[in-house]
Amino acid sequence: DAWVRPVVAFTQLGHVGWMVSLSVAVLALLLWRRDWLHAAAWVVATAGVGLWIRAIKTSVGRPRPVGGWVPEGGFSFPSGHSAGTFVLYLMLAWLLLPYLRPAWRWCVGLAALAVALGVGASRVVLRVHYASDVLAGWLLGLAWMALVICAVEWAQTRVAGRRC
């Protein structure tokens, strides 16, 4: 089927190899800029969500749907592509926000959200995940990312408070 190829190409934005490569590049840039707090947050966010995914998949052990359009191994719940892309692309957008003009902030944020939601949807379309796997992945990604961002905001407030 002709529609499968573009959907498979799009879902690769959530492939672990691509996400690790992008994560390393972003980390290298943050370290080069000597932005230690955001570098630490980036590692905790991206590596942490991977650890959560692995732990939950192993604990739940839900088999994948039968008859997927592409071969996929491992357990199904939660969707690692969904959780990983949510954290990766939205954290990247959050890191970019201070450097963008206000009009571009919405564009970048919405583009990141569109990629995360699109990758998750592609997993259901390709029949390698149930919708509940994807929803759980998105919620896991959102919760983990929110926790990391709150920790960074708290740390920045504490540091700013000491300077006064």
Give the ranges of each region predicted by the language model.
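Hydrophobic alpha-helical bundle signature of multipass membrane enzymes
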Residues: 1-75, 91-98, 102, 110
